[in-house]
Every structure is written in C-alpha cells, then in structure tokens.
Amino acid sequence: MGIVEGITEWLPISSTGHMILLEQIVKFNASEEFMCMFRVVIQLGAILAVVVLFWGKLWPFGLRQGRVISKPSVWSLWFKVVAATLPVLVISPLDDWMEAHFYNYITVAAMLILYGVLFLVVENRRATPHVMRLDQITYRDALLIGVWQCLAIIPGTSRSGATIVGGLLLGLSRACVAEFTFYLAIPVMAGASLLKVLKFALSGAAMTGTEIAVLVVGCVVAFAVSMGAIRFLMDYVKRHNFKFFGVYRIVLGLIVLAVAAITALA
C-alpha cells in the first residue's frame, strides 16, 4: 500500500481508485478502524518527500553575509497555499460522512471516468497558459484552486487531479500547477493524517506492535516511492500533456466497474 500511495498520491490518477482495487486483491488482516487510519496516515511519508525535494523553495529564511534573512517570495507562496487551504477547512467536517457513504466501487469508478474525460477536454482546448511561474499565481487563483481541491472529498476524484484540472482551466502552465499542487498537499494531507490519528486514539482503539511496524514501513515506502513519482511528474509535464492520465483514468474506471460487477455476481 505504501508503493501504491507513493505513486498515486502525486499522479492525477486517484489513490483511492487503486486502493479499493488493492484491498479487493489483497486481504489485509487488520481492523477496519486501523485500515481507515492507515490509508490516510501513510500520506505523511508522501508529504515528507515534497518537503525534502522542494526544501529550498519552501523554507522562508536564508543566510546573507552571516545574517538570517527572510524571503518575501517564499512567504507569499505560503500565504497563497493557506488561501487555497481555506475552502478545504470549510468542508472537512464532511470527510468521514463522505467516506462512509461514497467509498464504493460505483462512486470511485464514476469519478475516475469523469475526471478522465475532463483531462481530455481541457487538454484539447489548445489554450495558451498565462501563468508560467509560481509568483504569478494570484490569491484569486489560489482560492479557486482550493475550491477545486474540495471536490477531492468525493472518493475516486484525486486531489491532484482536481487541482490540476482547476489550475489548467485558470490558465496555469502544466509545470506550474503540478508544483503548486505538491505544496497544497502539505497542510491538507498533514492535517488529515493527524486528525485520523487523533480520532483513532479517542475511539479507544489501540495499535498492536505489528500494526505500528506496518504503519512505519508504509510511511517509509511511501516516502521513497514519492520521491521518484514527484521527479517523474515534474519531468513529464515539461514535455507532455495530461491526456495519457485522462485515458488511464477512464480505463481504470472501467476496470473498477468490472470488478464491482464480478463481486456483485459472486
């Protein structure tokens, strides 16, 4: 699961869509409460990969002639990340309800296919992007991308998929929106992971030594794989568009529907 998380969290192909298939193929001997928490908490490893890879762009302090200086451009970037996170805070109370009612084959397949089609439509517009650098992103852009990010509350949507589609429609270049999407993950995924751990602890549940080891290994694997996935996507979008991911999502959605039909008939 750490490998799947590390790859699918950053590519716009829906980690949930892959997880729901993986859970069908591989039967995990763990409680539903632990698995629910595990799926979210291993994202911490993925987030750490972003911090490590982009540390120079994310740390707002530097040294000049032996003195600590502040970097206004980095602070501006963080303020825009915060602006994009605000819409998520508004809808976050619905997260558990959405997972309980819509974490199923049909919803996941529908979102996979829908956003697959959206990627193809958006890329076929032949529109010329006017936002090529992160410092050209306005607070309005950031807030609207945050609204798109809210759609990821629906299982199968893909957080990166929603924000990339939104960013492309707003006129961001592929490389710019991909990088901004990585940064948005830091507060959103870290907050979601910590909230899941807190809820798990308050429920009175306790992890066994084996479960703790599995969680740690999952985070480490997610970190290592994420390093490669992020590098791959940043290099890929410099030379290609997102049509491949659109087709991939549609095919995966059809596979999920087929698995749902087979499961229902079994």
Model regions: which residues?
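Multi-pass membrane proteins that catalyze or facilitate reactions on polyprenyl-/lipid-phosphate substrates
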Residues: M1-A266
